Amino acid sequence: MAKEFLIELGTEELPPTQLRTLAEAFAANFEAELKGAELAHEGVKWFAAPRRLALKVAALAESQSDKVVEKRGPAVSAAFDAEGNPTKAAQGWARGCGITVDQADRMVTDKGEWLLFKQEVKGQPTSEIVVELAAKALANLPIAKPMRWGNKTTQFIRPVKTLTMLMGSDLIEGEILGVASSRTIRGHRFMGEKEFTIDSAEQYPAILEERGKVMADYEARKAIILADAQKAAAAVGGIADLEDDLVEEVTSLVEWPVVLTAKFEEEFLKVPSEALVYTMKGDQKYFPVYDENKKLLPNFIFVSNIESKEPRYVIEGNEKVVRPRLADAEFFFNTDRKRPLIDRLPELEQAIFQQQLGTIKDKTDRITELAGYIAEQIGADVEKSKRAGLLAKCDLMTSMVFEFTDTQGVMGMHYARHDGEAEEVAVALNEQYMPRFAGDELPSNGVSTAVAMADKLDTIVGIFGIGQAPKGSDPFALRRASLGVLRIIVEYGYNLDLVDLVAKAKSLFGDRLTNDNVEQDVIEFMLGRFRAWYQDEGFSVDIIQAVLARRPTKPADFDQRVKAVSHFRELEAAESLAAANKRVGNILAKFDGELAEEIDLALLQEDAEKALAESVEVMTEALEPAFATGNYQEALSKLADLREPVDAFFDNVMVMADDEALKKNRLTLLNNLRNLFLQIADISLLQK
């Protein structure tokens, strides 16, 4: 027999940003426990609301299946001595099984005969083991800071108030986290029944929705919020900004979602929309509304946790809450504009970037110089890049950014425009932080690009330079900064070398850095970011490793190599040539002497080695234009033509000949062959 199983843990308010993660982990952990216990079932569904985590298991077996456990002992040849008496090994094994040697069965295999112990194990009832399984699943949740409550010694992410475990209509008795299982379930704080009893697992979650006014199905709540918010925005002629992270957080904050629309005074629209949106989304968890031209409208959408008979009062209440925050933004905006950004530059002396690396003013000076250098390399306006670098961090000293930290950069752009700075300079103040996350847009112009790269490189080199390379945590977001630099160079195709960029950035720190290997460490770190990035892009690890083996420090060049090797791998000749390169590498690794640069044609004896020597010579000359222009795909496509002469060489030529001169000449030929491929990648690392 199989029944539906329910477990619900009633808690105090769970952290909204962690609710989905907790619920999914609970389900995954519990399913793993069920499989480990060999309890048949047809799937686990999770439920999550602000004050509960729950699971329902479909068709959970009422008990484990009976099974026969076999334990193999020593081979019969080792189990008995010459007189046929059990050896100590056999006796020890039998004792461990709880039997005597003569009670053991025999197992015959192709490799011989063995002692065997068979034991019939009766399956345990689910009701007797499921409590422990659930407790283990909860104990392994990803909880960074568990807490204790009352006088209990148990710990969980929040205090636990109720526990319900039902197998069909049967109550599973037991205790988890200091709370005994019962049929009592708590409803909504302000609507429905505060507490009620549940008769069977099948009633969940419908009974909770009907009697408790709690929608336990997380995805259903989210779907309602999305659909109703879109309708509400359309009703005022707009489109709701339904950023998924915020939708997830709001879904995790409400038990009974009611979507409402409110408004604010149009005069606030004179303030840059980013500041208003920061207030609405960050502080109040509201959804802004835009028109079809992406212009902010004087409306916002919010999700109430109660179904009020007078929703207008709920709307008015939220409008009253947001109005002072918008007024603050307006005040800061008007006040900040009374002083030009450049006047705030000296104030950066009072803000520490990092104790050993100096103030933000020190960082600004380095960014200014480095941005000018990069601008020169990529053909951007040097003076504008330096000006943007000088102003880059000035908005950190404004009231707006001090109060609304996420507006840094974008407010600098607005203030720079107000001050009459060049448009490229103003835009760069915002775009210096791009790309902010994976998949984000890149800076839109050369000035922005120069400043963005300068800022990131300064941070990376500085932190590595004082020996604080990221290990587990990454407080300075160096991984993201590195990927940002690489993306900019690769996607814009800049012919920039990390060696030069890192060396220039290092030179600007004077004697502040203490790590003598900072340049090498930074480059190795950034090459490691290549591996992660290109794996995410779908390139296999062996292709990436084949290119990294050549340690190319020009990101755009690295990109071309990876794509070329990826194309080469699909060619018919690839597998054979990769194996040949591996073979050549192994042969050369065993040779301890020195090889000539050129082969001696007079020493060529076999037709196959003559053919390969001629092919390598012709190919070397033919590939010069491709190598010079970085056309690696064309080069590898041509190198694929070497498959036949290479295969013929290994089939017909003894490389390690007894004649030393002959052997060295053949090794030189193979070395020249391998070097052709190594100008692009080490294809011997390619897997089948």
Swiss-Prot record:
Superkingdom of origin organism: Bacteria
HAMAP family assigned: Gly_tRNA_synth_beta (MF_00255)
InterPro entries (alphabetical): DALR_anticod-bd, Gly-tRNA-synth_bsu, Gly-tRNA-synth_heterodimer
GO-annotated biological processes: arginyl-tRNA aminoacylation; glycyl-tRNA aminoacylation
Gene Ontology cellular component annotations, sorted alphabetically: cytosol
Localization per record: Cytoplasm
Protein's recorded name: Glycine--tRNA ligase beta subunit
